[in-house]
């Protein structure tokens, strides 16, 4: 099996069911006691080092400027340097970040962890954050044009000795990035979009597409039909351009004696550590993600992973309860069997 597996670096925005994250939210509001360590960062180190050991391939460092979350670039740089195989996927918001600065940050991180960094372009985001941090909120086609310019400038600076660009949103005159990425192939660009224009943007500009399905989907069969249609549509678009785009998915993965048991255990763990959790996060992000078919018995999950790979997916960026024990269990029950020589036995369960 060639499927790659990823997970989210644990930060308050992206994590549920974690006592360390619950503590980090309170801890972030005040100075640390002398000698104390930040709970959020320590969980990230422990979790991703365990994930590195059991075969995970990628970690997404999401960015939430208005919140208790650590800055993605700082968090990624501090943790990725301790890992051996995991690639750091760092989120960036055009409109809040300057492309020249991001090009330098990316080149720096790529030299610290050669070939193990990529950029997740977030084209649409939380308006309140943009307003608070002085960003410019754009809509529709304007937003895509800005993002395309942003990416073109980064790639130009990585590639050329001297690079100039004069666009609608950015201008660079005789720009020089004297620190180049470590590898000849520049850092890859990931993004997500569901609109027709957004899909064209992915095909024209990005290397990876996070495929989404309707959050209103009520069954795994409905999700699979939606994913199949989306990939068929994108395959037709890439065939017209000749560009290769890789496909990724964000399912929630939870182990249990059945799908119902896995979901029940997950919900209990969430409420055990936070009696008043972010219900929006659960209802809009976690519960729909469980319908991708990756909860339940390990053998059933392994078979679903194989179906997703057969459909064309190359990466599963897993949503999960962020604990070292859970990560190790997923490595032992899902990743290792699928990558072993005994693939037939792994799928048979």
Give the residues covered by each predicted segment.
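N-terminal small/glycine-rich loop or linker at the start of catalytic domains
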Residues: 1-34, 126-129, 168-186, 263-293
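Flexible, glycine-rich active-site loops centered on histidine and acidic residues
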Residues: 2-38, 95-164, 210-226
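Acidic (Asp/Glu)-rich catalytic clusters
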Residues: 49-53, 76-85, 106, 110-117, ...
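Glycine-rich, proline-tolerant flexible connector loops at the mouths of alpha/beta enzymes
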Residues: 58-79, 213-224, 319-329
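Hydrophobic faces of well-ordered beta-strands that scaffold small-molecule active sites
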Residues: 5-9, 59-61, 87-92, 117-121, ...
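Active-site mouth loops of central-metabolism enzymes
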Residues: 11-42, 92-100, 141, 183-196, ...
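Alpha-helix-loop-beta-strand connector modules within alpha/beta enzyme cores
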Residues: 70-90, 146-153, 232-237, 331-349
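N-terminal beta1-alpha1-beta2 module of alpha/beta enzyme domains
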Residues: 1-82, 186-187
């Amino acid at each position: 099996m060639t499927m790659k597996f990823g997970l989210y670096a644990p930060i308050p925005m992206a994590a549920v069911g974690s006592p360390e994250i619950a503590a980090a939210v309170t801890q972030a509001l005040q100075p640390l006691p002398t000698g104390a360590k930040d709970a959020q960062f320590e969980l990230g180190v422990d979790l991703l080092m365990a994930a590195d050991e059991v075969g995970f391939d990628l970690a997404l460092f999401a960015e939430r400027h208005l919140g208790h979350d650590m800055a993605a670039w700082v968090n990624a740089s501090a943790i990725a340097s301790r890992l051996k195989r995991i690639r750091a996927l760092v989120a960036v918001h055009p409109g809040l970040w300057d492309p020249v600065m991001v090009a330098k940050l990316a080149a720096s991180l790529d030299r610290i962890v050669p070939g193990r960094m990529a950029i997740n372009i977030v084209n649409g985001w939380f308006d309140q954050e943009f307003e608070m941090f002085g960003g410019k909120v754009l809509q529709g086609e304007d937003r895509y044009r800005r993002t395309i310019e942003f990416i073109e400038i980064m790639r130009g600076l990585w590639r050329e000795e001297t690079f100039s660009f004069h666009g609608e949103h950015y201008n660079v005159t005789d720009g020089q990035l004297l620190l180049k990425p470590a590898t000849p192939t520049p850092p890859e660009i990931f993004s997500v979009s569901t609109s027709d224009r957004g899909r064209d943007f992915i095909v024209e500009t990005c290397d990876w597409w996070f495929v989404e399905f309707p959050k209103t989907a009520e069954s795994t069969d409905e999700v699979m039909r939606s994913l199949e249609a989306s990939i068929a549509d994108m395959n037709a678009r890439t065939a017209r351009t000749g560009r290769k785009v890789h496909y990724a998915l964000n399912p929630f993965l939870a182990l249990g004696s059945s799908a119902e048991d896995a979901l029940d255990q997950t919900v209990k763990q969430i409420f055990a550590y936070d009696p008043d959790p972010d219900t929006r996060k659960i209802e809009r992000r976690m519960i729909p993600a469980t319908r991708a078919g990756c909860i339940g018995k390990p053998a059933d999950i392994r078979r679903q992973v194989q179906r997703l790979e057969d459909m064309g997916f190359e990466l599963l960026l897993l949503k999960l309860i962020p604990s070292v024990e859970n990560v190790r269990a997923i490595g032992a029950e899902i990743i290792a069997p699928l990558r072993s020589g005994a693939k037939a036995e792994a799928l048979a369960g």
